Amino acid sequence: MQYYKELARRLHTLQSKNEKEALEKQIDFLDKLVVEVDSLVHEQDLRPLLEFISPTESWFLLGTATIFYIKLLTHPDPESIDVVIKEAYVVRAHRILSIFQEQFIENVVKEINWEILAILISLSGIENGLVRNLSEFLSTSILSAVPRQKFLLYLLEKYQINLFHREERLTDQGRPVAFELPPDKFHSDQSKALLEPKWKTKNYLISHLIFWIIDQQSSSSIEVCWHRIIPSVLRILNDLSPNIKLQGIELVNRLLKITEREFLLYTGILKILKDDLLVFYTFIPPRFTIQTSVTLINASFATLVSLYPEENENLNSIMLNGINSVFQFAFDYPLILQAAFSQIMVLTDKMNVSYLPYLTLTLDELCRIIQNPQIIQIPSTLSFFLEILTKLLEIYSYRISAHHVELLMALVVCSRNYMRCNLQEHHNAIVQALQNLFTLIKLNITVEQLGDYNVILPLLEPLQIPL
């Protein structure tokens, strides 16, 4: 017994140190412990180790196979931990926890250890299937034996608040200590607080717990606990980590599904959410990778449209304060532009004639894009933008005559630059798209404007584009 007590003491000491160092020192111990536990299971005599899984004792097995295990799995920067060591630890800790799962459930229920239950539910969102399945089994078993409403009350009134609570020390004069620091130190601390908020070190997977809380609510009960849930959702939505932001958007979508629209308008939360989501259009390279930016912008757009599905004022905001930011700051990123124009097609479908005030801006941007050498050298991307231009001109064909000069000039430049590149991929489709656009313009301009069309014909003859 003394041997196990000494190990328990050492493991508790290691938990306060660097994760990687602690893991390396625990691997050998866990190997020996797994072998010993397996032998005890085989002999059907777990009594020598039972006292060490009790939360009232040394938290020995809980400390090794659960608490530290959970800290590792919910670590905000998993890349900082060696993957091989991490997997080795997880497998061994999982084995121990699996063997003692009945005693674990019994002790958590007996001690009403809500925090452990909260973290187990959070782990349902982890990628590791082994861990996720065990966590779901344990949390389901514990929930069936404890008062669910009391647990929900604990999560709403204590756990969330403590997790997101900001500890701010004050000077004798009542001013925050941070403001008394030298400027360099102040900015350093503030930056670290924004990038690495303390809640991430406590439960990096908190959003999955909030998913669970929301799923337990009805349209009436969500209104009662609204003031407890929405601050946490907004904290997650406004986090600087892209992955956390995406979870925040999903949380907003869950709330929108069960909350009455009148209640959202009454509380003013719709406008707050709209403003927060529009900021996503500024998350472009080099701050984020191109793919991350596209993912954030697309997710934000889908939620923004659902906020005010029938109101043009909201759709106007998406165009002016959202997509317009992409035009201004992401012109050199074709994938982001593709996402923006895909969204524009959705807006034109919803707004119809109400989109006309933005048609000139949209056509000007498209003309710039199809003349961009960077775009022309990517046939699939060029084909996409030519298709978008064709669809827009078909929808608003009665406005072609007002823009025919800019359109013809852009198409001539695009055609000449494309033919010079001598690209074979999508060649027939691109030539056909250019031909269709010239024809579409010709059919929708006045007799007087046909003179402008005829002027460009000699420029196209060497390009072998049939008109």
Swiss-Prot record:
Component of the tel2-tti1-tti2 (TTT) complex that stabilizes protein levels of the phosphatidylinositol 3-kinase-related protein kinase (PIKK) family proteins. The TTT complex is involved in the cellular resistance to DNA damage stresses, like ionizing radiation (IR), ultraviolet (UV) and mitomycin C (MMC). Component of the ASTRA complex involved in chromatin remodeling. PANTHER family: TELO2-INTERACTING PROTEIN 2. Belongs to the TTI2 family. Pfam families: Tti2. Signal peptide: none annotated. Component of the TTT complex composed of tel2, tti1 and tti2. Interacts with tel2 and ttiI1. Component of the ASTRA complex composed of at least rvb1, rvb2, tra1, tel2, tti1 and tti2. GO terms for molecular function: protein-macromolecule adaptor activity. Disulfide bonds: none annotated. InterPro entries: Tti2. GO terms for cellular component: cytosol; nucleus; TTT Hsp90 cochaperone complex. This is Tel2-interacting protein 2. It comes from the Eukaryota. One of its GO terms (biological process) is 'de novo' cotranslational protein folding. Keywords: Chromatin regulator, Coiled coil, Nucleus. Residues 4-45 form a coiled coil. Its main location: nucleus. It is found in: Nucleus.
